[in-house]
């Protein structure tokens, strides 16, 4: 399988009142197409920082990252905009990237249909269950057609039973859409 993400010697330090804090030190790993990996550790150990660096949202202090293709990043909270319908929410990434072509709109509408949210497209986020909101957030992330998907505790706000169900749904979606 082809290597699609290479992380080499990533370091991240922050300035604090009493000196530097080393959040990440010499983190290295590769991800091949089709891999599913988990980054596990206690709160505050730098998992979210690492994902933010990989996605380009936060600068690294040193090291190298090589990415083959687009990255989709789904944060802990669904970050759906409450004043926008589900349909407008799932198109947001395409709007931001100025890539709202007819082909991409149709692709996104198909994702809504395929994953059971099309009939809720005119609803607002407050009208959906937690699991449905997470699926909408995932569809918004998938709409930009990422090759790599980063999930930062994307289901931590859900109860245990819903989390299991949504995790299983998402794994099926990633497999069906051929996303790493």
Please provide the spans of the model-predicted regions.
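Conserved ABC ATPase signature
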Residues: 124-128, 132
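Catalytic Walker B motif of ABC-type/P-loop ATPase nucleotide-binding domains
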Residues: 149-152
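Helix-to-loop junction immediately C-terminal to a conserved catalytic motif
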Residues: 55
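Conserved ABC ATPase "signature" region
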Residues: 102-120, 171-172
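Short helical segment in ABC ATPase nucleotide-binding domains corresponding to the A-loop/adjacent helical element
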Residues: 87-95, 105
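The feature captures the beta-strand-to-loop junction immediately N-terminal to the Walker
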Residues: 40-42
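A short, proline-enriched helix->beta-strand linker immediately N-terminal to the Walker B motif
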Residues: 143-147
């Amino acid at each position: 399988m082809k290597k699609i993400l290479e992380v080499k010697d990533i370091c991240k330090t922050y300035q604090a009142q009493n000196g530097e804090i080393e959040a990440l030190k010499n983190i290295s790993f590769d991800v091949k197409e089709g891999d599913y990996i988990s980054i596990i550790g206690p709160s505050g150990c730098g998992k979210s920082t690492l994902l933010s660096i990989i996605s380009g949202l936060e600068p690294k202090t040193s090291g190298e990252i090589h990415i083959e293709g687009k990255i989709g990043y789904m944060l802990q909270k669904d970050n759906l905009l409450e004043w926008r319908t589900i349909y407008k929410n799932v198109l947001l990434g395409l709007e931001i990237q100025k890539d709202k072509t007819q082909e991409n709109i149709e692709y996104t509408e198909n994702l809504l249909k395929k994953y059971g949210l099309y009939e809720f497209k005119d609803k607002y986020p407050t009208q959906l269950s937690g699991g449905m909101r997470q699926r909408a957030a995932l569809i918004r992330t998938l709409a930009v057609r990422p090759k790599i998907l980063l999930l930062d505790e994307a289901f931590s706000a859900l109860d245990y039973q819903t989390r299991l169900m949504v995790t299983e749904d998402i794994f099926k979606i990633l497999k069906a859409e051929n996303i790493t």
